[in-house]
Amino acid sequence: MVRSRTKKNRLEIGGSSVCRKSPVDCWTFLKYHGKIERKAVEGMLKQGTENRSQMEFFCIDQFVPKKHLLRKIDKAVNFDHIYEMVEELYSPDNGRPSCDPVVLFKMVIIQHLYGIPSLRRTVEEIDMNVAYRWFLGYTMSDKLPHFATISYNFLHRFTEQTIEEVFHWVLDEIAAHHMLSPEAVFIDGTHIKASANMKKRIKREIPVAAKKYEELLMEEINEDRENHGKKQFTDDKNDTSKTKNVTESTTDPDCGVFNKGEHKKQFAYEAHTACDKNGYIMDVEVTPGNVHDSVAFEEYYDRLTESFPQIEYVVMDAGYKTPAVAKKVIDSGRIPVLPYKRTNGKEGCFKPYDYVYDEYYDCVICPNNEVLKYSTTNREGYKEYKSCPKICEKCPELAKCTQSRNHQKTVLKHIWSDYMEQTEDIRHTTGMRELYDKRKETIERCFADAKEKHGMRYTLVRGLSQVTKWVRLKFAAMNIKKYALHTA
């Protein structure tokens, strides 16, 4: 018999009082007193499986929510333009019937929109998802293309040029609706982990790749040396004697080693990306992970400005703050927006800005008001100004100035340093700080969304060409998503 408890802890069921807190006692009470049968309780709680084989007639459109993302994309974008881009890749009068190229592109867009890691998994998800089938124009009984068919087409049929055309077509659609704002462009790079094991690697000696601006730089170096009465450098353009040792993956030779943190390394690619103030990705250049931002900048910048000549401001982080990048942007008639970059040097020593350059006499004045005279211009484009050791060894500030054995201080000044000074003047101009601060909500947000929501943290494809196509398709899908949400 159930013990009596306070009223608030008891429950009246069928005229009988049971305890609220003790399900075991409650069930025992009900079971032995016959107030509620066990089958009746199961009938209230259990969902049967009798309907699994039941046949129904329904309309797929009714099962896709009105506010579903794919509905918005289908309304905003006309994918029939893809037929024109791939028309030359198909033969109209021979061969077996092919899969619809628009369906293939839509399936890959679904993969990138929802961050599905593989094409095999993508086909499985589409096979069971009503909204995905509705987006493709397939009924629930229609057979989907095999995942190998999609893979083969994007590996062999659709080239980098085809994917680039699709990417720019999406941008043209956005620009046609006045949603693209290319006046200020935000540039940065992000690393993508490659499908390669760090243990499968070899050491290789390769020739040092010449930078695009080296020829122009050498001309100005020789001109400066000639003005100072020095001999010109005679460099052979075909000289391949300069080499460097690199770590190469045997799995994916196109990727490069990226130092992730102080002790961790990984094979990776880097996506050098540009976007506008609304977060629409305007262009991307994929390089191995060991290529510095400033090295990949020139070719990528030329292509970007050719596509969008209305660019006025180029916003970049400290990785792009080099004389070559500053010269490239300023000479093109645009304004580089760069941050403050802390100077290198030992603590307690004089900073580079403590040494004042006298343009009229072409010399440098040290903090102790002594003159450092011009010595030479080296092959890297730096003019060297050196002090007199006899004067320096008696200087009371020698310890703060230099630790060289011969007590001689050398100050380096790049022949394009005037462009760096212009970037500092621009940095202090009204409105530039606010413009630079928008990086976190534009380009950094693009990278965060791509990695967290769209599966760009690592890639399963291999080779620079395939990774480039993979990244462009992912960014095209992100642009389509943003465009559809803005026009909804």
For each feature predicted by the language model, list its residue ranges.
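Anion-binding and metal-coordination hotspots
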Residues: 41, 46-49, 108, 115-128, ...
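Hydrophobic alpha-helical membrane-insertion signals
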Residues: 36-71
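Basic, short loop/linker segments at the boundary and entry of helix-turn-helix/winged-helix-like folds
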Residues: 66-109, 114-115
